[in-house]
């Protein structure tokens, strides 16, 4: 969405920098997390614990989420595990903001009787998955192991979820620094203004050894 607006801003040489998400076909810089590396680290924890039938829930209208999925696929392939299409649930961002999405996740998981672990692409999906599992009478990690990207609340320690922690403050700081440099240099192209941050992972107790 709004791709035409961004192209017009670029045509007018107005500096634009993307935060967290971005468009591949624009020459604007961005500040992002290395989501593929993050996926490899999260999946390694599940695979090392003996999980093979791993489900994932991702947004197809969000490039960062697609990167997370690709990282998951690569991690499973590298470890000799099959990525099963029906173990992946795709949705649009707006859909995941609806309370009814919990029922959709519940139906998805009930269709995967061999699934033992779930990868959540962000905190919103994580909350929906927890609610769906509660409706199903399932426990974490006794029935399902769980990992989450971009946990955006400060409760990950209390929740005990293995996750990557959202770096909102640092990302905002990096965006501001780079945007000021672009304004000072009168640049609108990505000339080394992009920053790719290393993921920060928290190891909780949401993964069960099999």
Language-model segments: which ranges?
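Flexible loop/hinge segments that line or gate small-molecule binding clefts
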Residues: 1-38, 124, 150-161
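Short beta-strand/turn micro-motifs composed of small residues
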Residues: 20, 32, 58, 90, ...
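Hydrophobic alpha-helical segments within soluble ligand-binding/sensing domains
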Residues: 29-56, 66, 73-74, 97-106, ...
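An alpha-beta-alpha
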Residues: 40-80, 191-208
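Short acidic capping loops at alpha-helix termini that bridge into adjacent secondary structure
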Residues: 52-53, 83-87, 139-146
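Short beta->alpha junction loops
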Residues: 87-98
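Flexible loop/turn connectors
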Residues: 106-210
């Amino acid at each position: 969405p709004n791709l035409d607006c961004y192209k017009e801003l670029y045509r007018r040489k107005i500096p634009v920098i993307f935060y967290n998400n971005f468009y591949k076909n624009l020459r604007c810089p961005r500040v992002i997390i290395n989501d593929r590396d993050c996926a490899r680290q999260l999946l390694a924890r599940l695979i090392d614990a003996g999980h093979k039938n791993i489900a994932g829930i991702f947004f197809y209208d969000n490039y960062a989420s697609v990167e997370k999925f690709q990282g998951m696929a690569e991690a499973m392939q590298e470890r000799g595990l099959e990525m099963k299409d029906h173990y992946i649930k795709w949705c649009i961002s707006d859909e995941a903001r609806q309370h009814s999405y919990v029922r959709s996740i519940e139906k998805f998981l009930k269709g995967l009787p061999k699934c033992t672990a779930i990868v959540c692409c962000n905190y919103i999906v994580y909350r929906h998955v927890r609610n769906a599992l509660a409706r199903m009478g399932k426990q974490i990690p006794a029935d399902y192991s769980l990992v989450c990207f971009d946990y955006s609340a400060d409760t990950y320690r209390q929740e005990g979820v293995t996750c990557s922690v959202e770096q909102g403050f640092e990302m905002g700081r990096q965006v501001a620094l780079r945007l000021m440099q672009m304004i000072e240099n009168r640049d609108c192209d990505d000339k080394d203004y992009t920053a790719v941050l290393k993921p920060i992972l928290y190891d909780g107790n949401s993964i069960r050894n099999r």
